[in-house]
Each structure stands twice: as C-alpha cells, then as structure tokens.
Design a protein with these regions (language model features):
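Conserved hydrophobic/aromatic beta-strand scaffold that supports enzyme active sites
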Residues: 17-22, 66-68, 100-102, 108
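Mid-domain Rossmann-like dinucleotide-binding core that forms the NAD(H)/NADP(H) cofactor-binding site
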Residues: 127-182
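Short gly/ser/thr-rich secondary-structure transition/capping motifs
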Residues: 12-18, 50-51, 92, 128-133
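Cytochrome P450 core scaffold surrounding the K-helix E-X-X-R motif
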Residues: 42-48
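Short beta-strand-to-turn element immediately C-terminal to the catalytic PLP-Schiff-base lysine
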Residues: 6, 47, 70-72, 102-104
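NAD(P)H dinucleotide-binding glycine-rich loop of Rossmann-like/cofactor-binding domains
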Residues: 45, 76, 87-150
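Glycine-rich beta-strand-centered segment in the early N-terminal region that forms part
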Residues: 21-38, 50-95
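Extreme N-terminal starter segment of soluble prokaryotic enzymes
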Residues: 1-2
Length: 182
C-alpha cells in the first residue's frame, strides 16, 4: 500500500509517498480503508523530528482518519455495532497517512449523517479527548459548572460546544486578550 513517509525531518518537503506492507488488524482492532486524514499539531511536530510515535505504533504520521471498515476482530466489532462496509472515523496512535490503517475498535465512531469523510476525519482527537475526560471521567451533568482552560484551542472549543449542548454552565480562559476577543 502507499503511505506518507518522513524521509527528512523539517518542512513538508521531507514527506514522500512510499510503499509499505498492508497492516493487519489484531484482537480488538479493525482495518480501515482510509479516505481522509486529519492534520494535528503532533503530526507537524513528528514531521519536524520532535515527537516519536509511541512504542509499537506505526512511524507513518496521521492520528485521525475516516474511511470504510474492511475487516477486523468480529467479536469486538459486534460489541461496538460496527460492520464491514461501515463508514467510521477513528483516533489512532499513528499510520493514518496511508491507504489503510489499523484502529482499536473502541476508538472508532460512526461517521455522523451528513458529514463527508474529510469533515469526519477532523473529529476524533478533539471529541474523544473531551468526551473521555469531561463526560466519562468527570461525569459532567446538566446544571454543573465547567472551567475550560485554553478555550481557544480545538479541544477547548469542542469542550465549550459539548458542555453547553449538555446543559452545563461554561467558564473559559485563554492565553491572551487577543484569543479571548476572537
């Protein structure tokens, strides 16, 4: 399969298309035919040589993807209600800038109705981060107050939107007066 490889750390010119072996989905994973990938700050930092992939993760950049499920762990997919052929978006540890990638089933979401794959590929990192921390761990409820520090970031903006949608009162900080005004 084709994948984006970092051939030289630094500017985008160090990214080249190369050939890589097809990844294989293991227990609790699925294989996605990638149609869109997000670009995140960690991807840029990795390209510049300042962020190593986690141990065992692909060295191919790309942490957010959208595409079609090709295969996977049938039991894990059934528990998640995911079938072969479904459109999903996923948060992965690396490997998203390729024709295919492997994702943990628990880090996949169905592509929302009306969303293109390009739009869906922008969702996983911010939405998983906010949902996991604010709602799963923090158990935010309607009527409660949530302080969001760094409210002008992608994760901050997502936290504001979700907290308000679920009926919380939101207080926000940002790093500068300019960020607070915009």
């Amino acid at each position: 399969m084709q994948a984006v490889e970092i051939t030289a750390f630094g500017p985008p010119e160090g990214l080249k298309i190369g050939e890589r072996p097809m990844p294989q989905a293991g227990k609790g994973e699925l294989l996605i035919r990638v149609s869109a990938s997000g670009i995140n700050r960690p991807d840029v930092i990795q390209r510049k040589g300042h962020y190593a992939p986690p141990p065992g993760a692909s060295d191919i950049p790309g942490l957010e993807v959208a595409g079609v499920v090709e295969s996977g762990d049938a039991e894990a997919m059934a528990q998640a209600g995911i079938k072969i052929g479904d459109r999903v978006c996923a948060l992965i540890a690396g490997g998203g800038y390729a024709q295919f990638c492997v994702a943990p089933v628990v880090q996949c979401l169905p592509v929302p109705k009306g969303f293109s794959d390009i739009e869906a590929a922008s969702l996983p990192e911010t939405f998983f981060t906010v949902w996991s921390n604010v709602f799963d761990r923090g158990r935010l409820q309607a009527g409660e107050v949530l302080l969001i520090q760094g409210g002008s970031s992608g994760i901050g903006v997502t936290a504001i939107q979700l907290a308000k949608a679920f009926g919380a009162t939101v207080i926000v900080t940002a790093g500068s007066d300019d960020k607070c005004q915009n």
